[in-house]
Amino acid sequence: MHPLDYIINSLGCNIIELDENSLEKKYIKDFLINTGANSYSIKNIFKITESRNDIFFNPYNFDKRYIFFHGTKPENILGILSEGLKISPVQAKFSGKRFGDGIYLSDSYEISIVYSKKDKDKKDKKYILLVEAALGEKNKDYITHDCEIEKEHTFITEEGYRILKIPCNSKRNGIIVVKNAMNVRVKYIIEV
């Protein structure tokens, strides 16, 4: 067995490169551009399916599920894919805890890309995750940007989760802190 195949098999998920002409990739690119990614070149988008972590997702059956960004370093991606996102993992470098321990997500590409460092081997590449978060009631003390999401501003995927279609030039800067790791799962890896 090739070593790369061994690593991919050990992750416990499938990684599928989205076709350049797929509608799914178009919606994701539009979402990225409308949330601040227009200064970055989107090189590739990978969809994560059949993750062994999916069986633990959303144990409280929250009906509000949204897509958010999560910036991370390239060296963290394999661990995230195999074990899921963690609340303040021991091996992670400290990058701020403005709202305490939790998984920090954002509705803004511009905020999340700051936490994504360049690949050491390929100096021009960064990675950002699109994650699905199952949310219960919001804690108003922690909300920096709150608005009602109208139905016409969302795209429902085949899997039933919502992708926000943010109007052009809309400024988003919300930080969402999820306190339970089982309420978050990785759906896409974006290479920029």
PLM region descriptions:
Residues R52-N58, G79-L81, N139-I143:
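Short, solvent-exposed polar/charged micro-motifs at secondary-structure junctions
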Residues M1-N76, I176-V192:
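Intrinsically disordered, low-complexity terminal and linker regions
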Residues K47-S51, L81-V90:
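Eukaryotic beta-rich interaction modules
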Residues Y6, D30, K47, G71, ...:
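Ordered, helix-dominated protein-protein interaction surfaces in large eukaryotic regulatory proteins
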Residues F68-E75, P89-D121, V131:
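Extended catalytic/binding region for NAD+/ADP-ribose chemistry, centered on the ART fold
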Residues N38-S39, P59-D63, S95-F99, L105, ...:
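Intrinsically disordered, low-complexity regulatory regions enriched in Ser/Pro/Gly/Thr
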Residues M1, L78, I87-Q91, S116-V192:
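Active-site and NAD+-binding cores of ADP-ribose-processing enzymes
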